């Protein structure tokens, strides 16, 4: 596993089977291999945790999945990305076979979650 700090609360985790990008809104991103899926998380709607720039990543990485906190308005998601976007609520579990994500109530806004990818669990 490789963890790369991007900016503010944003970082990238690379595992054997996927990339996980957290709360990206600005900063230099490394190159992504198209062989692995890219999961993009936004923990809540504040502009230093969610920006529409994440949807530009689809052009360079077609195997992309967006997991957004329930408090982010769905109208902020471009039409071209709607099928690749899931909204996570506290108590909800999303599982696509590669990544399992469970939502928890946050102490602030948005959602905290636990990700399980091949026995690696991270809480954010």
Model-derived regions, located:
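Core dinuclear metal-dependent hydrolase active-site scaffold
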Residues: 1-35, 86-124
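A generic "cationic amphipathic patch" detector
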Residues: 16, 53-55, 79, 114
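A generic "binding-loop/recognition-motif" signal
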Residues: 9, 46, 72-73, 90
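Short, structurally constrained coil/turn elements
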Residues: 60, 79-81, 95
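Short secondary-structure boundary micro-motifs
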Residues: 3-4, 49, 70, 76-78, ...
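Short, aromatic/basic amphipathic alpha-helical patches
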Residues: 75-85
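Short hydrophobic/aromatic-enriched beta-strand-loop microsegments
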Residues: 65-68, 83-90
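Active-site metal-binding motif and surrounding structural segment of the metallo-beta-lactamase
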Residues: 26-72
């Amino acid at each position: 596993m490789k963890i790369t700090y991007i900016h503010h609360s944003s970082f990238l985790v690379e595992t054997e089977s996927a990339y996980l990008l957290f709360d990206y809104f600005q900063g230099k991103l490394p190159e992504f291999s198209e062989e692995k899926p890219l999961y993009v998380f936004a923990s809540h709607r504040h502009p230093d945790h969610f920006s529409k720039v994440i949807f530009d990543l689809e052009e360079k990485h077609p195997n992309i999945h967006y997991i957004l906190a329930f408090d982010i308005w769905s109208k902020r998601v471009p039409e071209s990305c709607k099928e690749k976007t899931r909204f996570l609520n506290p108590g909800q579990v999303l599982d696509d076979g590669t990544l399992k994500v469970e939502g928890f109530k946050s102490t602030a806004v948005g959602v905290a979650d636990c990700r399980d990818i091949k026995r690696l669990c991270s809480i954010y």
